[in-house]
Amino acid sequence: MSWQAYVDDHLMCDIEGHEGHRLTAAAIVGHDGSVWAQSATFPQFKPEEMNGIMTDFNEPGHLAPTGLHLGGTKYMVIQGEAGAVIRGKKGSGGITIKKTGQALVFGIYEESVTPGQCNMVVERLGDYLLEQGL
């Protein structure tokens, strides 16, 4: 399966039991900031934004004072799982980022998708990739 198929079929799909509800944008990005696959709607990000995200995984709490920035959008960092998951909130939407051995799995959502639904979709794929040694 191609990386794009993982994004299309496992991240940008309808939320289980909620037809028509899906993430706004999603991507799989290598730890080095290289995009493996992304939805057409995933924001163009700056290298320093990705560096900040990677630093927060290695030093949990790094982004809390300044917020998480991606594609020029600022998210307030909310409780995640140190070294494994970063979660951010902006208005009625937000972002979930799951770290695997080699990649970061991103999910961005807006109203109609709940934070819990985004977490479930992103973390399920991230956990699967971890099980595969990725």
Swiss-Prot record:
Main location (coarse class): cytoplasm
Oligomeric and partner information: Occurs in many kinds of cells as a complex with monomeric actin in a 1:1 ratio.
The keyword Acyltransferase belongs to this UniProt entry's keyword annotation: no
SS bonds (residue pairs): 13-118
Miscellaneous information on this protein: The variability of the residues taking part of IgE-binding epitopes might be responsible of the difference in cross-reactivity among olive pollen cultivars, and between distantly related pollen species, leading to a variable range of allergy reactions among atopic patients.
Residues modified as Phosphothreonine: 114
Listed name of the protein: Profilin-1
Keywords (A to Z) from UniProt: Actin-binding, Allergen, Cytoplasm, Cytoskeleton, Disulfide bond, Phosphoprotein
Cellular localisation: Cytoplasm, Cytoskeleton
Top-rank taxon, per record: Eukaryota
Family: Belongs to the profilin family.
Gene3D superfamilies assigned: Dynein light chain 2a, cytoplasmic
Protein species of origin: Olea europaea
Functional description taken from the UniProt entry: Binds to actin and affects the structure of the cytoskeleton. At high concentrations, profilin prevents the polymerization of actin, whereas it enhances it at low concentrations.
Listed transmembrane segments: none
Any GO MF annotation of the entry: actin monomer binding
InterPro entries, per database record: PFN (IPR048278), PFN_euk (IPR005455), PFN_sf (IPR036140), Profilin_CS (IPR027310)
The record's account of how the chain is modified after translation: Phosphorylated by MAP kinases.
Any one of the GO CC terms: cytoskeleton
Motif Involved in PIP2 interaction mapped to chain: 84-100
